[in-house]
């Protein structure tokens, strides 16, 4: 569930995610002068064994194919995910690899959303 979900039932999960982001921001400020950079990565609906299990369950509950279960989930639960697919673990890993590289030596205290543009901001 994304941090920005409107589902009231997800309040505790959203609260925990907000806490993780606040922790990352606080640690980034605390340890930057020691050369430690802290950032967060917030993936959305990623192709994992957990989401496979979720979609298998949804498929059985709805009496539809696995792919149709994903499509209905995206339409109903994640209408703001513009790419209309699950992200791949490699796409999240690429962001993490960048953050671990020398190319990110001036990146600190940021949250990288790997989420298909789920949250539109300026």
Residue spans of the language-model regions?
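Single conserved hydrophobic/aromatic residue that forms the stacking wall/gate
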Residues: 1-12
């Amino acid at each position: 569930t994304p941090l920005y979900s409107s589902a009231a039932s997800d309040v505790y999960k959203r609260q925990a995610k907000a806490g993780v982001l606040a922790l990352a921001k606080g640690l980034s400020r605390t340890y930057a002068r020691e050369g430690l950079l802290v950032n967060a990565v917030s993936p959305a609906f990623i192709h994992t064994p957990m989401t496979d299990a979720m979609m298998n369950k949804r498929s059985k509950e709805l009496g539809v194919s696995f792919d149709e279960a994903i499509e209905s989930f995206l339409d109903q639960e994640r209408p703001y995910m513009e790419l209309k697919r699950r992200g791949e673990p490699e796409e999240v890993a690429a962001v993490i690899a960048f953050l671990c590289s020398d190319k990110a030596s001036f990146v600190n205290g940021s949250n990288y959303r790997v989420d298909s543009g789920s949250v539109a901001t300026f």
